Regions:
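Short secondary-structure junctions
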Residues: 26-32, 87-92
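Conserved short beta-strand elements that form part of the metal-binding/catalytic scaffold
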Residues: 28-61, 105, 112-119
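Vicinal oxygen chelate
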Residues: 4-12, 40, 57-129, ...
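N-terminal beta-strand motif that seeds the catalytic metal site of vicinal oxygen chelate
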Residues: 1-15, 45, 65-69, 119-129
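Amphipathic alpha-helical segments
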Residues: 13-28, 81
Length: 129
C-alpha cells in the first residue's frame, strides 16, 4: 500500500509561508535550498517551492486546492492560525450532532486549508484517530 509522503506548493514568499506553518502547526524545518523549504510533522512533509525552481518551469502545472489539518481543538487552533495571519473562509461545517467540526482558512499566500476535529475525521472521513 502506498503512503502519502509530501505535499508541495509553489509560492513567491517561501520564508513567510514556512514561518506561518511552523508557528501555526509546529511543523519542523527539515531541509532548505535557495528555491525550496521542506517542513515535516514527522509523518508527512510540506514542501514550499519558489517559482524560480528549475523543476517547476511550465505554465501547465496545476496548483494545490487545500491542505487539511487534524487538530484536537478547532477553536484553539483557529485562534492560533488567525493570530499568525490566516483569514477564515466561508461557513462552518457542523456534524449532525451539532458540534463544530471543521473550519476553512486561507494562509498569508491565499492557500486554503482546513482545521478538522477528531470526531469529523473519524465519522465522516473514516480516519482512525
Amino acid at each position: 500500500m502506498a503512503k502519502l509522503r509530501h505535499i508541495a506548493m509553489v509560492v513567491e514568499e517561501m520564508e513567510k509561508t514556512a514561518q506561518f506553518y511552523e508557528k501555526s502547526f509546529g511543523l519542523q524545518r527539515v531541509r532548505q535550498t535557495d528555491t525550496a523549504i521542506g517542513l515535516s510533522d514527522g509523518v508527512v512533509s510540506l514542501v514550499i517551492i519558489h517559482p524560480s525552481n528549475v523543476n517547476m518551469k511550465g505554465d501547465d502545472r496545476r496548483g494545490l486546492h487545500h491542505l487539511g489539518f487534524l487538530v484536537d481543538d478547532v477553536d484553539r487552533e483557529s485562534a492560533k492560525v488567525e493570530a499568525n495571519g490566516a483569514v477564515r473562509q466561508g461557513g462552518i461545517i457542523n456534524s449532525e450532532r451539532g458540534t463544530e467540526t471543521e473550519r476553512k482558512f486561507r494562509d498569508p499566500n491565499g492557500q486554503m486549508f482546513d482545521l478538522t476535529s477528531p470526531e469529523y475525521a473519524r465519522d465522516f472521513w473514516r480516519i482512525a484517530v
